[in-house]
Amino acid sequence: MNLYESCVRGALRAYKLTLSPLIGRQCRFFPTCSEYAAEALIGHGPVRGSWLTVRRLCRCHPWGPSGWDPPPPPRRKGAKWTCET
């Protein structure tokens, strides 16, 4: 585990121990928003992972969708975008 991954996991653990009990378990999705954030930040890095996390948090509200919503799989390094018709 590298330093970045340790920091992400530590920050999410601190959230789960301090703020999460006050807010309650109200996430409409699985994995929960904090688990999604960990997977997105570690799998995609700080920039894209943060963007994916913000998008997910914007979808997590009482009138939004619910259910299974995992982060997209990480892009392979060196992979090129292609468009098949």
UniProtKB/Swiss-Prot annotation:
The keyword Repressor does not apply. Its main location: membrane. Keywords: Cell inner membrane, Cell membrane, Membrane. InterPro entries: Membr_insert_effic_factor_YidD (IPR002696). It is found in: Cell inner membrane. GO terms for cellular component: plasma membrane. Transmembrane segments: none annotated. It is a peripheral membrane protein. NCBIfam families: membrane protein insertion efficiency factor YidD. Belongs to the UPF0161 family. Could be involved in insertion of integral membrane proteins into the membrane. This is Putative membrane protein insertion efficiency factor. It comes from Phenylobacterium zucineum (strain HLK1).
